[in-house]
């Protein structure tokens, strides 16, 4: 089979909105007390479980009547009984006042500088120079949640988005063939830079946070990710997909930036040779791509079926070049 991949677009701000509901919430404390709910996409170093368990730090900022800061980078923690989040500094709703809130969270403070005077909207990042899944900085910023009148007393919904870039490769089982994801290598990338949120989305608007990224240093770092156990599909009937992911600083792509994927497909199986895994190595040259079928605010998905019966789809996510453009990479089929 031929496995050459084409790049249609690699500047994809990969942020999905997720829903949450207040149904069944149990009130705790004063009915006038300002409480929160923190939700975000379960991917990256910080997922919903680690956030709920307090493994990542979550801080809230809040302004009353467009001028009075009532929450100044205040830590919030989750109450397990109700699922609601409470700040270390208590505040009550005031009827007739308007409010604006947002929050940020991070997985580690080593290599991360947060400008608290900018309420977490500006950061500096130094990611590890060799890829370590457990040591990567994961930074999240919520949408802005606005309340027109404190008399409404809502639970403040904090929808957190990842600010870092994600490179994800999926293999989806096609017909009768098994596949294994072996290794990802991302070459000549930046690991250091500053990031500034230039447009913060408002909750429930359908928009997303937009970051201005200024990398610094040299783009000569190589990230390699090899699963401890090869990601396998097809070993069980219900096991129909596998994926690998690298998280890093949003990149400004150069002619030297290259992504390499290694995977195996069980091909030409016979009764005498039930396991005939063939290694494939695909190289993505990520420079001078041309975006196609761009539509702001929507994830565009392309799929293709390789003749082995395995559907391959690669997603290169959240690159900062001229603008955030959505797209994917695809195998070329002959």
Language-model region placement:
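Sec-type signal peptide cleavage vicinity
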Residues: 2-6, 17-334
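Sec-dependent N-terminal signal peptides
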Residues: 6-12
């Amino acid at each position: 089979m031929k496995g050459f991949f084409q790049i249609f677009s690699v500047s994809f701000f990969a942020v999905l909105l997720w829903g949450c509901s207040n149904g069944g919430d149990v009130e705790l404390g004063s009915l006038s007390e300002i409480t929160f709910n923190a939700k975000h996409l379960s991917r990256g170093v910080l997922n919903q479980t680690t956030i709920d368990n307090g493994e990542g730090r979550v801080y809230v900022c809040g302004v009353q009547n467009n001028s009075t800061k009532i929450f100044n980078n205040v830590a919030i923690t989750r109450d397990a009984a109700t699922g609601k989040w409470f700040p270390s500094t208590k505040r009550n709703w005031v009827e007739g006042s308007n409010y604006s809130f947002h929050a940020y969270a991070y997985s580690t403070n080593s290599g991360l500088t947060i400008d608290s005077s900018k309420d977490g909207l500006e950061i500096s990042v130094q990611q590890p120079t060799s890829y370590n899944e457990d040591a990567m900085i994961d930074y999240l910023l919520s949408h802005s949640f606005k309340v027109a009148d404190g008399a409404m007393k809502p639970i403040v919904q904090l929808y957190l988005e990842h600010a870092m870039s994600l490179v994800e490769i999926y293999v989806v089982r096609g017909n009768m063939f098994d596949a294994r994801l072996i290794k990802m290598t991302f070459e000549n990338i930046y690991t250091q830079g500053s990031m500034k949120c230039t447009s913060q989305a408002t909750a429930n608007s359908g928009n997303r946070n937009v970051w201005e990224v200024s990398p610094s240093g040299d783009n000569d770092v190589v990230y390699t990710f090899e699963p401890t156990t090869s990601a396998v599909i097809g070993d069980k009937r219900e096991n129909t997909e596998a994926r690998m992911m690298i998280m890093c600083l949003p990149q400004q792509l150069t002619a030297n930036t290259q992504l390499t994927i290694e995977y195996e497909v069980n091909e030409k199986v016979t009764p005498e040779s039930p396991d005939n895994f063939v290694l494939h190595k695909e190289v993505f040259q990520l420079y001078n791509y041309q975006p196609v079928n761009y539509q702001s605010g929507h994830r565009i998905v392309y799929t293709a079926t390789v003749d082995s019966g395995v559907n391959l789809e690669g997603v290169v996510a959240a690159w900062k070049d001229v603008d955030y453009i959505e797209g994917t990479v695809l195998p070329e089929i002959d």
